[in-house]
Amino acid sequence: MMQRRDIDIYRLQPTLQDLKDHLRITDDSHDRMLMIYLSSAVLQAEHVISRNLAPSICQIETDYTSLVTLPYMDDTSSLTDLEVLVDGERRTWTLIGSDVRIDGPEGQKMSISYHLDVAFVEADIQQAILLMAAQHFSNPLDRAQTLPTASENLLAPYRQWKTR
């Protein structure tokens, strides 16, 4: 099974401009690296709180099965543009929570693509992301060992412990 998730870096919360304001940067010379730091900080926060924080385009390619659990889905994400192809042909489907039931006859291979949207990221989560991205900017070498304490404290109320 192949799973791919491409983050829409231009719709992140907080934005690149928020990070530049936080760091008091007024020119565009650091934008490329700041975007990498911001994306990394968002993913770090996602891992800490077990919640999707980034608008994304997702794709799954796998052998046929009539029921697929969509990765990266959670209670705060909204799903749009879901498309299911079985052996290259579009299929109808039914969404049940984060599971997709495929209608029609069995096939060999299937591909599922969808967009995940995040409507709202709380202010304290955004602040934690800004602090983490700022730490990446301040320490471009591999010296930062852990999350900044302030970031940990801001994310702690949102941490969800999941069992698998």
Features from the language model and the residues they span:
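Divalent metal-cofactor coordination and adjacent catalytic microenvironments
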Residues: 1-164
